[in-house]
Amino acid sequence: MRKILYLLAFGLMVVSCELETSGNGKLDGYWQMSQVDTLATGGSTDTRESFIYWGVQGKLLQIRYSENDVYLGEGLLFRFEDNDSILTLSSPFVHHLYETDEPIDDVEILKPFGIYRLVEMFAIKELDDNNMVLTNDVLRLHFRRY
């Protein structure tokens, strides 16, 4: 009788567990922006010391930035879609750690992070276990998995 109860308890534990995945594949994770290339001029800037990080999980993308590698408690939040090698960011918010998040309606807030529209579309040029390269009409953004 005891064996039956153990088997029943084990069976209930197994069927009660759910394996949930986001379906984002290699895009999921934490990425450090390492370089920004300006397409019009061919210029390039090393951004590793800027401490700009993109975190991707579920259907949210968070951009965190630091000063001297110290997180300030603020960042940006976006909804995103990944369709046919196109990454679309939309619904931007300023994320405050201890306050209510605020919707963004001024694109100037986003430009330092390589985003030039409130609904921005990036072509995914490279995406593997270690690197990601995104391009829009203005910039090419290089990331390394962090």
Feature-to-residue mapping (PLM):
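Tryptophan-anchored aromatic micro-motifs
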Residues: 26-42
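Contiguous, well-ordered beta-strand patches that form the walls/edges
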Residues: 37-48, 57-127
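Edge beta-strand at a domain terminus
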Residues: 77-83, 127-146
